[in-house]
Structures are given as C-alpha cells and as structure tokens.
Regions:
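Compact beta-sheet-dominated domain cores in extracellular/mature segments
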Residues: 2-124
Length: 124
C-alpha cells in the first residue's frame, strides 16, 4: 500500500514550525527586561551592553540637571519613566552640545548619536 501526504498540509506544518522557532520581530534582548516601569536606564555601551545605571522619580528632581557620575557616560538608554527625558552630551545639561528628548512611554534607544553625560526628567 502506498501512503500519500498532501503537499499543502506538509507545507503548512513546516511553515508553522518555522514560525515557532523564529523569535518575534519585536522581541527585546534580555537586558531590556532589566529596565522596569518608572525607570530611566542608561547603559555604558551601545546595544544595551556594559554597566547599567538606573534612576527613578523617587531620587531624581523633576526638571533638574542630573549629571552621571564623574568619568561615566552612556551610549544606550531606555526611558520608562512616563515622562519626557532629555539626554545631554554636556555634563551640565548645556544646550551648546548635543541633546535629544525621548518620550516617556517606553523609548528604547540602542545607540545614542553622542555619549550621554547628563539628563533631565520633565514634568510632561
């Protein structure tokens, strides 16, 4: 007796297996899970690598310039504070250097165009 497998059924099964084995397009690297709701996380290196610093509203004054510790910079950041955050190239939040504001609704920036040395969290 000869067994016949329907090609469409086999194709569908193989496609389903391939989709299960492939990570979701928007899946975040494991390091991103370390930045919790209400936090601003800054990583020393691009792509969320290296030492991570975490700030939240309990220890950070709104609309005040917060310099990173002396000699420390960040090249990746995640803003989950719920408020806009401006990242500055200048350690004094001077607008003569590069700066950019990131929305607070879950912004993930794997590679800043400059080394971040300070930030401000805004009211809204």
């Amino acid at each position: 007796m000869r067994t016949t497998i329907a090609l469409p059924a086999l194709t569908t099964s193989l496609l389903a297996l391939a989709l299960l084995a492939t990570p979701a397009a928007g899946a975040a690297p494991p390091a991103l899970a370390d930045c919790g709701p209400g936090e601003l996380c800054l990583w020393r290196d691009a792509e969320f690598k290296g030492e991570r610093q975490t700030y939240d509203l309990t220890g950070t004054d709104i609309e005040s310039c917060v310099a990173l510790p002396k000699g420390t910079t960040a090249q990746a950041l995640a803003n989950r504070t719920g408020r806009p955050v401006t990242a500055y190239q200048s350690e004094h939040c001077a607008e003569t250097g590069e700066f950019q504001t990131y929305p607070g609704d879950g912004t993930w920036t794997p590679r800043s165009p400059y080394r971040v040395r300070a930030f401000k969290i805004w009211e809204h």
